[in-house]
Amino acid sequence: MSRVCQLTGTKANNGMAVSHSHIRTKKLQQANLQQRRLWWAEGKRWVNLRITTRALKTIQKKGLGAYAKSLGIDLARL
């Protein structure tokens, strides 16, 4: 399974790890993905999603159906 958020499409970021002596090495910063089973009220069913914690906070604020609609995602396919 790929490490990509199913709603936002967030994936890993290429960054640098900088030591105390300022030696820089490449580092991969992974997205904070969580496997969640969320209730989709409009579809009257549970939906299993692998989403970032940022997307989870937005879902708690807006609701799953409204957030997916704003992103242009059809939850019926998931």
Swiss-Prot record:
- Residue pairs linked by disulfide bridges in the UniProt entry: none
One of the record's GO cellular component terms: ribosome
Q: Name one GO molecular function term.
A: structural constituent of ribosome
What GO biological process terms does the UniProt entry carry, in alphabetical order? translation
Q: Which InterPro entries match?
A: Ribosomal_bL28, Ribosomal_bL28/bL31-like_sf, Ribosomal_bL28_bact-type, Ribosomal_bL28_sf
Instruction: Identify the keywords attached in UniProt to this record, alphabetized.
Output: Ribonucleoprotein, Ribosomal protein
Please give the Pfam families that the UniProt record associates with this protein: Ribosomal_L28 (PF00830)
HAMAP family from the xrefs?
A: Ribosomal_bL28
Q: Which family does it belong to?
A: Belongs to the bacterial ribosomal protein bL28 family.
Listed NCBIfam families: L28
The molecule here is called: Large ribosomal subunit protein bL28
Organism taxonomic ancestry:
Bacteria, Bacillati, Cyanobacteriota, Cyanophyceae, Synechococcales
